[in-house]
UniProtKB/Swiss-Prot annotation:
The modification Phosphoserine is found at residue 78. The RING-CH-type zinc finger domain is required for E3 ligase activity. The lineage of its organism: Eukaryota, Metazoa, Chordata, Craniata, Vertebrata. Signal peptide: none annotated. Zn(2+) 1 binds at residues 641, 644, 669, 672. Residues 284-308 form a coiled coil. Pfam families: RINGv (PF12906). The keyword Ubl conjugation does not apply. This is Probable E3 ubiquitin-protein ligase MARCHF10.
Amino acid sequence: MLHEARDRQKFVSDVQYLRDMQHKVDSEYQACLKRQEHKKEPNEKKQEQLWGKDTSDRSRFSSGSSCKQSSGEEDSLSEARLATKAPTAKCEPKLPAIDQTSVKQKHKGTMTLKKPEKVSPSKPSAVAQATKILSRKRRPNLGRLTVSPEMHSPRLSGERSRQKAQLSTKTSGLLGADPVVQQDSLLSANEMKLKRPAREKRNLAPSSQLVRVAGKAPLERQKKGDPSARPQNEPHTALSQTFQPMSGSQVLTESSVPPFLPATVVGPRRAPFRFHDEDFYSALSLNNEQENYDTEEETRTEEELLLAGMRSPPSYKRSRFLGTSAAQNRNVEENAENLRGNSLRRSEPNPGSPRKTSVTEPTTKQSSPGQRMLQDTRLPRELAKDNPSGDQDEKTPVPGDAKSDGVTQVSAEDVSNNCAVEDRSAVHNCERDWQRYLSGSRNSFDCLLSGRPTAPRASVNPSYNAHGSLFHSAVIDDIPASLSVSSILVPSAELEENLRFNVRRPLSPIRNRNPSAASESHSEDTQGEEERASTSQAQESPLLSDLPNPQSSMALGDSPSSPTRRHLQGHFYMPGSLQENIPFTFFAVSDFASQNDNGTSVRVSGVMDEKATEIKADPEKLRKLQESLLEEDSEEEGDLCRICQIAGGSPANPLLEPCGCVGSLQFVHQECLKKWLKVKITSGADLSTVKTCEMCKQGLLVDLDDFNMTEFYHKHQQSRAQSELMNSGLYLVLLLHLYEQRFAELMTLNYRRASRERMSRNYPQPRPEESESSESGDGNESNVYPGRVI
């Protein structure tokens, strides 16, 4: 008991000790966590201050001396700052405030930059907090978007920019004091400002938007004749010359950026396909909240600038397109200015579209038709990605003009045919170099340039050329962002056919498209392109007559006898840069898998018919085989014994028919029957049961020469009785022996009692002391003897 109590007490004390230790460890862990939080807070504050300082420096450098704002704009900025509040903000980054005006003010181009000197780093605004959170939430993975190693290593990009500064200086010198060049330099500076924070991997949204807005304000001042915009253009020109080799968007000079700005549509879009690249597609996902306008705009602008750098031709190909005449550029600018006012009138709110885009800037920076051709073929995905359905009506530039449909038609023709190429041999060399530049892709989109006519068509209707880039955004705005780029990069005459594959069925792009892969040689590609160019020129006017109405154009593309469909299937090429975009390459490769659907279906149908006939013939053969096997078994086996299952019999052991059973139970061997009857008799069955068949319940006709069933039964019964008698005698003998043993023991006990009584009678009674001693002795004897008896 003592040991058990001690063990129990020890166990209780151990449990208490363990509980105390656990409580102590938990308290120490909580204290450690609190200390870490206290240490982490000052570090985060320091880091946020550094980020805010760096971002404010960048915004101050990008804005320059001309980034001033009126008192009305400051009031609107303060109202927007109070309106937008991010409840989930945990940290307060010291970032410059972002002008967040209404959608109508964005259309009118009044969104400008607040002076960074007025932004105090100690008091961050709620707009900056919300913008930082949104930028972290919706930022794409820029490392996955980049193609050239210049995007990954800023040191290498800086060296290349210094090496190629002279080339960019010569290029800008060729154009002279053209205002379009200065606009281009502003946009190149914007690109540099967008890509500098890419090395820091975060906090890109506020500074990039500031740079974008800073670039828009001087442009509008320059259009209005404001002389203050001129001094700011000069430093930006120098910056663009330094940054030109790295950006990759200087390829087309002043026409490289206009599709970016109209493409920043903040309306709803379809949810794209999702692959392993979740960060990229999460940036393209739909967001209908009004306070996210600025973040969505600058995020898409950055993605478009990066994607523009992926598909840029080399610098010596640049110079060929830079050599267009200054007179053409001035003519295009004048027409663009005329169309700008009409576009502003068309950009008023319309119930057909949930949100409107700004069509102010793109019409002011259009260039030669050759440059516009490269621009549209290079950026179709960005335009398709950022233009939702329902915005087609606002892309028509002249609302009151009776030739508004013709504008779209002629602009489509300019997209396909206004390619300023001087000689095809030089273009072949450029194409081969560009293919080598884009990871050695053999069938790049440059083959489309080789077969186009060399005569530009800018003199036909120069006022319509300014809207060449808007054609794609007006026609393919229903295409989801996850579709292959190769499904969009088709020239004008095949555009309706491309809509047939993409617009009406956005959720099944692989099944509904059937383009053939370009497996011919390079010379065959160029010949096929020339044939297709001639055919498309002859069929442009009837095919493009209904393009402002997308449903009619899609119905036209659905006709199976359309010649453009045959040309599309015969000559369709993948751009080489698709190898660097895995999510897009998936769809592009799937096109190759579905290129031979017709022939494959014919062959598969023939094979299936043959297999079906074989399957029909197989049951007949199986049935015949089974019947033949059964016949052979019956012939070979013959009559079987139902006990031993052996066919046939012998004269010494013949087959008998003892009962009325039929079939496989009809016959039985003689020896087998004897053994079976003996077993039944020895098992204790009576004679009637032994003589009855177990199956048919009829009497057995047993007439065996050497076996008498009745005699065997009687003998067995006699032997059984004898064995029972012998067993009973043995039992009696055993009982007698037991009784004898017990009787002897009882006799011994009786003898001892008698002898003791006799001794007590013969001897007199002793004295009391002697009697006591004798009684003790008798008691000892009585104790001993009963032990013996027992």
